[in-house]
UniProtKB/Swiss-Prot annotation:
Citrullinated by PADI4. This is Something about silencing protein 10. Essential for gene silencing: has a role in the structure of silenced chromatin. Plays a role in the developing brain. Part of the small subunit (SSU) processome, first precursor of the small eukaryotic ribosomal subunit. During the assembly of the SSU processome in the nucleolus, many ribosome biogenesis factors, an RNA chaperone and ribosomal proteins associate with the nascent pre-rRNA and work in concert to generate RNA folding, modifications, rearrangements and cleavage as well as targeted degradation of pre-ribosomal RNA by the RNA exosome. Transmembrane segments: none annotated. Residues 375-386, 441-452 have a biased composition (Basic and acidic residues). Belongs to the SAS10 family. The gene is Utp3. GO terms for biological process: brain development; chromatin organization; maturation of SSU-rRNA from tricistronic rRNA transcript (SSU-rRNA, 5.8S rRNA, LSU-rRNA); ribosomal small subunit biogenesis. One of its GO terms (cellular component) is small-subunit processome.
Length: 470
């Protein structure tokens, strides 16, 4: 192949020189006759440019098939201006060079073959450079393949990548996960003897104020979490547990209200449990900074803060439920008993509650019912005002009604006290005032039922009622 390429290059160069020799005189005459026109190629190119252009045209005319076949040859560059040397001399030189190379490589061929035999065939390099080119990323190779072949190649590539990844993972060692490379860039820290810098403090001799100061400096969130734990446990015990009992007994029907109470109850319990775990870490002197419990506490606190908006809206209803439970129990929670103001029999109490929960108007939580009960007086007042206005509009053309003064017709009757209207109450009040006056005039007899045990109201040591002698 090398000989053929050299012959082809020599022949082309000889043809160009022959053409250049034949046309040199003609071109000189043309140049002397008239200058080249701008449309002529000689106006822009010389002989060397024309040679390269003709060569590129010939290559394009032959097509890419011959170019690809030429790439399969050994990586020998084709000479542009080769020397016109006989082929026999070239063959002799090549044979001598091959013999010299063979003599040089005989010593290392055995060692190289042994090294190649010890390598896994799947990890060894190929023998030809062309195997590593013309991948499936180009449009040319994909165009001649079907969709099924392309998918098969992609699947094989994926499997091969997984095999390589598993092999690399198995090759990892413990040193690969260390931070030795970071320690190399770290600044050397001067080592100080702990016995010289450590100050031993006797906490028994430290005052409470100093202890609190040290505690706030070390972990400022500890005291706040303790106070928050006390508040949340008190709220769970006094408010949420009674309401959860009402939900379990069916007094508060299932709905959004009961779901809200259960959510808040579980949220508070989880928050208190995480605070308790944090306190255990502090008691065991375990560093809590960066511990997952800190992130968990922040999450629960954010959720509790989101519930504060709903707590403000339902605070009055919750207080009403708690007072009703502490006072009259389930009887006060029965809406039909409040509307009719009658005392149903105890045997029918459960039936009434069951009917109320089954009716569609009581599908919502009991909290909404008490909200309606609070709004009832205002609705009644508005209804009365509307009825009064309607009555006034209807009686605009009627006669004017008499006033209270005309209806009573008291005239010049003197004003009397209200107590004079009822003689029994009047004499009772008169007797009460007489007893008070009698107690101030005559001392009541107090018989000695037991021995003297001192003044009942106590003796004031600072009081002096004696008169000094003059």
């Amino acid at each position: 192949m090398v000989k053929r390429s050299r012959r082809r290059g020599a022949a082309q160069w000889a043809t160009v020189r022959a053409k250049a020799g034949r046309t040199a005189t003609d071109e000189n005459e043309d140049d002397l006759g008239s200058p080249p026109s701008p449309g002529d190629s000689s106006y822009y190119q010389d002989q060397v440019d024309e040679f390269h252009e003709a060569r590129s045209r010939a290559v394009l005319a032959k097509g890419w098939n011959e170019v690809e076949s030429g790439e399969e040859d050994d990586d020998e560059e084709e000479e542009v201006l080769p020397l016109n040397i006989d082929d026999e001399n070239d063959e002799d030189g090549e044979s001598s060079e091959e013999e010299e190379d063979g003599e040089d490589d005989d010593g290392g061929s055995s060692v190289q073959s042994e090294a190649e035999a010890s390598v896994d065939p799947s990890l060894s390099w190929g023998q030809r450079k062309r195997l590593y080119y013309d991948t499936d990323y180009g449009s040319k190779s994909r165009g001649r393949q079907s969709q099924q072949e392309v998918e098969e190649e992609e699947r094989e590539e994926e499997e091969e990548a997984q095999v390589i990844q598993r092999r690399l993972t198995q090759a990892l060692q413990e040193d690969d996960f260390g931070v030795a490379w970071v320690e190399a860039f770290a600044k050397p820290v001067p080592q100080v003897d702990e016995a010289e810098t450590r100050v031993v403090k006797d906490l028994a001799k430290v005052s409470v104020k100093e202890k609190l100061k040290m505690l706030r400096k070390e972990s400022p969130e500890l005291l706040e979490l303790i106070e928050d734990l006390k508040v949340k446990l008190t709220e769970v015990k006094d408010e949420l547990e009674p309401l959860i009992q009402l939900v379990e007994k069916g007094v508060i029907p299932p709905g959004k209200g009961s779901q809200y109470l259960k959510t808040k109850y579980n949220l508070y319990l989880n928050y208190c449990a995480n605070i308790s775990f944090y306190l255990i870490l502090k008691a065991r002197r375990v560093p809590a900074h960066g511990h997952p419990v800190i992130e968990r506490l922040v999450t629960y606190r954010n959720l509790i803060n989101k519930l504060s908006v709903v707590d403000q809206k339902l605070s009055s209803e919750i207080r009403h439920l708690l007072t009703a439970k502490e006072g009259a129990g389930k009887k006060d929670l029965n809406p039909k008993a409040k509307l009719t103001k009658t005392k149903p029999k105890s045997a029918k109490q459960t039936d009434v509650n069951a009917d109320l929960t089954e009716e569609p108007e009581f599908d919502e939580a009991a909290l909404e019912f008490y909200k309606e009960m609070e709004d009832r007086p205002e609705l009644k007042r508005k209804k009365e005002e509307n009825s009064a206005e309607e009555q006034a509009l209807e009686e605009q053309n009627a006669k004017r009604a008499i006033t209270y003064q005309i209806a009573k017709n008291r005239g010049l009757t003197p004003r009397r006290k209200k107590i004079d209207r009822n003689p029994r109450v009047k004499h009772r009040e008169k007797f009460r005032r007489a007893k008070i006056r009698r107690r101030g005039q005559v001392r009541e007899v107090r018989r000695e039922e037991q021995r003297y045990s001192g003044e009942l109201s106590g003796i004031r040591a600072g009081v002096k009622k004696s008169i000094k002698l003059k």
